[in-house]
Amino acid sequence: MASDPRLPVVLLWHMHQPQYRDALTGRYVLPWTYLHAMKDYTDMAAHMEANPAARAVVNFTPVLLEQLEEISRRIAEHLRSGTPLPDPVLALLGPEPVPAEPAERLELLRACLKAQRKQMIERFGPYLELATLAETLGTAERVSYASDQLIHDLAVWYHLAWLGETVRRSDTFVSILTQQGRAFTAAQRRELLSLIGNLVASIVPRYRKLSERGQCELSVTPYGHPIIPLLLDFQSARDAVPNMPLPQHPSYPGGAERAQWHVRESMRVFKQAFGKEPGGCWPAEGAISRGTLELLDRAGFKWAATSANVLQGALARTDPKAARDSRAYNRPYRLPGGSMVEFFRDDTLSDLIGFTYATWHGDDAAHNLVNELAHLARQYAEAPSPESAGTGVGGDGPKRHAVLIALDGENAWEHYPFNGYYFLRALYSLLASHPLLELTTLSECVARGIEPLPLQTVMAGSWVHGTLATWMGDPAKNRAWDLLCEAKLAFDGVMASGTLDAARRAAAERQLALCESSDWFWWFGDYNPADAVSQFDSLYRRQLVVLYRLLGLPPPEELAQPISVGRGSPEHGGVMRRAYAT
């Protein structure tokens, strides 16, 4: 590393969607997996394909990889033999008539409006006209006036708006539909469905190819996206919030074994998809504890990544002077006696992409971010050495520092004009050619020997405010944990009895993993939007019901009752949160 004076810069895009399929019906309750595939996963691959000098780490969750495979397969089967499509909104592109039941028609009308208003609806005149009409007719009293053609046209525009910008600019058929505006035929809907199926099916092969040619490092999250520190120890939630109320159960039963299962299964699914084992891990929500890092180290990961606010909390306990020293950040660390290297993202720069730059001109935003990085490169290079500074963190920047910018790789872009097209194109171009910056990957940083500092203390926390309060502490969140604990105890009892055959045992174990996902707990709490809370609350309880049925047990009656009610209107609809509370 000493031979290259440039400051290493790593972009990490985290791709995740929880399991939206209802295992009892086979239908997807929410469409976000295939929509983000055709828009964001597609565009993010295309930007790297268009610029051979572009580099990034792309993190996939196994539960997302499995959904991509299933959805693409079921679309292909439908086109080949007419089998049902997995999603009710996607099914509007198929040959079946629009449901006649008024309640179903109303639900479909409303579903086709779930797109960012300014950038995805108002951008297209015909879609805005249809959306305005749908809003007028979107009541139980008026929905009967919504014709089948209106609903079909609205569904076509919904999917056109959710297409990646790189597809919109290159696909002739999409241009034809966009110019036509209305009165789409069944044949056109089928062709659009075929395009969507091809886009979803192409995601894994495209990223695998980018990895094989050295542009993209692929990493993984434990299988079901669980908050591993909480699986290991509920008390870890009090590490950053000492007085946090906890669930009634003292701990998650068998949590250590479940955490190990999620890690093992993630490596299996990842290898099946990409043909090799992952070198690095982004723990779900960047949530870590000492036990979490030790578990990932034992699993053989070369690196793990989380947030600087977690590092700041840890340093403040052991070395307050270092916690205030800017040179302590954008540095790799390692537990004493461990092998795995820990990277802590630059929260400020990451949140600029997630929450600020969407309102800027894309080129201006990219230049601003690169200027911030160049300033850091000069600052680190000019900093005094450890000996002259008299601290343990030192300067000698490019040889010791690496800036990680890590964030959700899918939800930010709908707030940008053109799905972030101009920003991302300019960002990759500027970073790849800057004389002070080296666009690279985390495994390359490890391989080149950037010297890690010792991580003497670990504060359990996440990239959201440096705490675990997003997933525990609220009464609804704690109740959800208690319901999960009770289901796990039932699971343990049935497994110990030996009454299930091997296939049923495996199905129950995977279903338990889906119930352990962090996503359900994220949405509980009255500060979240009502619709999202209702949907995720219902789906979580449904996942638990499926688990009980796989175990051959009657589901508890309380699973028929909502856990939480949302009343809030958070930034970005609550799907993303800043590193620091505002």
Where are the regions a protein language model picked out?
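Short, solvent-exposed turn/loop segments enriched in Gly/Ser/Thr/Pro and often Arg
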Residues: 59-64, 222-225, 280-288, 443-446
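Catalytic domains of cell-wall/extracellular-matrix polysaccharide-remodeling enzymes
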Residues: 255-320, 411-434, 438
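Acidic (Asp/Glu)-rich catalytic clusters
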Residues: 49-51, 206-219, 381
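Glycine-biased, low-complexity coil/linker segments
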Residues: 389-392
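Active-site and substrate-binding clefts of carbohydrate-active enzymes
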Residues: 3-179, 320-384, 397-582
